[in-house]
Design a protein with these regions (language model features):
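Active-site-adjacent beta-strand/loop module that shapes the phosphate/pyrophosphate-binding cleft
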Residues: 32-37, 128-150
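N-terminal presequences and immediately downstream first alpha-helices
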Residues: 1-31
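A mid-sequence, solvent-exposed acidic-amphipathic segment
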Residues: 109, 115-127, 132
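Nudix hydrolase/Nudix homology domain
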Residues: 1-7, 11-12, 72, 78, ...
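Conserved Nudix-box catalytic region and its N-terminal flanking loop in Nudix hydrolases
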Residues: 47-50, 67-106, 148, 157-159, ...
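Acidic pyrophosphate-coordinating catalytic loop
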Residues: 18-23, 39, 79-80, 125-137
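Conserved hydrophobic/aromatic beta-strand scaffold that supports enzyme active sites
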Residues: 27-29, 70, 138-140, 165-167
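Acidic, metal-coordinating catalytic segment for phosphate/diphosphate chemistry
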Residues: 20-65
């Protein structure tokens, strides 16, 4: 069964869009109304939303050695009961005119020190559409993990990055999902891999020969 949204952008009327903060992130204040499920228009409402550019996420996978390469880094926006060091997939924001593949390759090298051989599109998602305008696209990236240095720390000094590498057997995917991983993109990437990883490995190995 396929799902189709009931309404589209033509069923939203924006009467005011004001930029109230313009820094690394942008904050907009919008006045709008939308079509309700009974066909009538809602009352006008004001919504504040953070606006970011699209981002690319990449789960790094070595099909030959059956390894997944993930990163750990500090994140400041965590509640007090959570550790601000998170296990994540490689990710980066799309700059103007940049292709997804270029972002994936750049971030894989900067954050994990590896080169991507090829990419497999997984899915797209919006992380928090109630207050954040951001569109993320997830890929699997083929790598050679044989030379990965787990003792190295990576990332760009100018972006205050301090990144540690973690290399997992693909057989550890379900165990990882049962642990305290709270990063949404990492959880979704591992869930996708649990469903499709074997097929992806077969596909990549077949075309490597």
């Amino acid at each position: 069964m396929k799902y189709k949204p009931t309404y589209h952008h033509s069923d939203v009327e924006v009467t005011k869009d004001e930029v109230v903060y313009d820094g690394f992130f942008k904050m907009h204040k919008r006045e709008l109304r939308h079509r309700k499920f009974n066909g009538e228009w809602s009352e006008y409402m004001t919504r504040e939303m953070m606006v970011r550019s699209d981002a690319i996420c990449v789960l790094l996978f070595d099909p030959v050695l059956d390894k997944l390469l993930m990163i750990e880094q500090f994140r400041p926006c965590l509640p007090e009961h959570e550790s601000p060091w998170l296990l994540e997939v490689v990710a980066g924001m799309v700059e103007e005119g940049e292709a997804d593949e270029d972002v994936a390759r750049r971030e894989a090298f900067e954050e994990a020190g590896v080169e991507i051989k090829r990419l497999e599109y997984m899915f797209r998602f919006v992380p928090s559409p109630g207050g954040l305008v951001e569109h993320l696209r997830m890929y699997a990236g083929e790598i050679d993990s044989s030379a990965v240095d787990l003792e190295a720390t990576l990332g760009l000094d100018e972006e205050h990055e301090d990144i540690k590498l973690h290399l997992f057997d693909t057989s550890d995917v379900m165990s990882l999902l049962e642990q305290e991983i709270v990063n949404a993109s990492a959880i979704m990437a591992l869930q996708w891999f649990a469903l499709h990883g074997a097929k992806l490995k077969q596909k990549w190995l077949a075309t490597n020969n």
